[in-house]
Design a protein with these regions (language model features):
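Sequence/structural signature of beta-propeller domains
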Residues: 21-378
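Bacterial N-terminal signal peptides
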Residues: 8-19
Length: 378
């Protein structure tokens, strides 16, 4: 009985990275972690890795933090709509409804808890808030947690300015970021399992911007997404003005400058926010939401925030790429029946997958208040 009990304890330890006897045992995410306070300087972006590990991009510290949340699988998920979620999140920290800025949002892959990267407006302190399946708002306390910090190479002449996205791809942690230099668009690769205080590899990304008709190095990669093509792993990145570009992960070598392949052009005047794959009706799609900074002069819909759905197979294109990449529209009219605007998602400022059939979305209303809504995948 004692042996069985120990084995069960060991399995729990492997899942959550806890102490068994005198040994520290970790899951897929960590090779070596540490315990203590995560003192964030910024909270640019969040995401999740294996075992529900929370990934936090801290551009001000040129670091990525991987933090154990302690959450397991839940049989319940958030449903319906929580109106005025911005006021409820602010109230959790004693602030007025306009007292916080929501920077990013991600759903825990097993518990369904929604995490928010936020910043207080008065003192600019970064923090992480949560909403559970019951709609209860909480503050995620990072004062005493199991975590690993990965340092991103940052020199005075190429200082990291912001981490724009993080993703766990096979056995690698990948982050996109901006730097203050000619090759401003950066991709960072970190081998996993993670070791506390390890450093990531630096790559400079060069991209053909279809709408601009030229190769560029400064435009930031706003969001990244892993996918498989012919047995190889790729990272798809969406940039401002708005090409969707793919990079083979095997081509990302240390200190190398890499050229991506532009496969789709969503149109100039947009900044992508979130992007992920999903399946529906036996077909694979990609869902991406964007902020249109040319909304006043050329709106896509009633809100500057709009969402597009396209067939996943478009990412596999090898011939019609870069200068020949397919456009979402031409002269203001739809150009491909494989790329469609999702009108039901107008106003969505942040979104993430919630299970197999739904999306949890932060939606902006006409009065600038925010609702948290569970929507069906289109």
């Amino acid at each position: 009985m004692r042996r069985i009990t120990w084995c069960v304890a060991a399995l729990v330890a492997i899942a959550f990275g806890i102490q068994v006897g005198n040994a520290r045992v970790y899951g897929k995410a960590f090779e070596k972690a540490t315990h203590g306070k995560v003192a964030l300087k910024s909270c640019d972006v969040i995401g999740f890795g294996p075992d529900g590990v929370l990934l936090v991009g801290d551009g001000a510290a040129a670091s990525i933090y991987a933090i154990q949340t302690g959450e397991g699988k839940s049989t319940k998920q958030l449903t319906g709509t929580i109106t005025g979620i911005n006021a409820k999140l602010a109230a959790a920290i004693g602030a007025k409804p306009d007292g916080i800025e929501i920077l990013d949002m991600a759903a825990h892959p097993t518990s369904g808890t929604v995490y928010f990267a936020a910043r207080k407006q008065d003192d600019k302190i970064p923090l992480i808030l949560t909403v559970n399946a019951a709609g209860e708002v909480g503050l995620f306390n990072t004062d005493s947690v199991e975590y690993a910090r990965v340092q991103l190479p940052s020199k005075p002449e190429s200082k990291i300015t912001k981490v724009s996205d993080v993703a766990w791809v096979d056995d690698k942690l990948i982050a996109s970021a901006g730097a203050a230099e000619t090759f401003a668009s950066k991709i960072f690769i970190v081998k996993t399992p993670l070791t506390h205080d390890a450093s990531g590899e630096l790559h400079s990304a060069e991209t053909y911007h279809v709408a601009h008709g030229k190769w560029e190095t400064k435009a930031p990669m706003s969001t990244i997404m892993p996918f498989q093509e012919d047995g190889k792993t790729y990272v798809a990145g969406a940039f401002a003005c708005t090409p969707v570009v793919k990079y083979p992960v095997e081509a990302l070598k240390a200190d190398a400058n890499v050229k991506g392949t532009s496969v789709i052009e969503l149109g100039s005047g947009n900044r992508p926010l979130d992007m992920f794959t999903y399946s529906k009706g036996g077909k694979e799609f990609v869902l991406a939401n964007t902020f249109r900074f040319h909304h006043a002069r050329a709106p896509v819909g009633p809100s500057p925030y709009w969402t597009v759905k396209f067939e996943r197979g478009l990412l596999d294109e090898e011939q019609n790429v870069n200068e020949k990449a397919v456009w979402r529209t031409k002269k203001g009219t739809p150009n491909s029946d494989k790329i469609t605007v999702v009108e039901a998602y107008h106003g969505v400022t942040q979104m993430d997958r919630l299970g197999e059939t739904n999306v949890v979305a932060l939606r902006e209303n006409a009065d600038k208040t925010l609702d948290l809504a569970v929507l069906e995948l289109p």
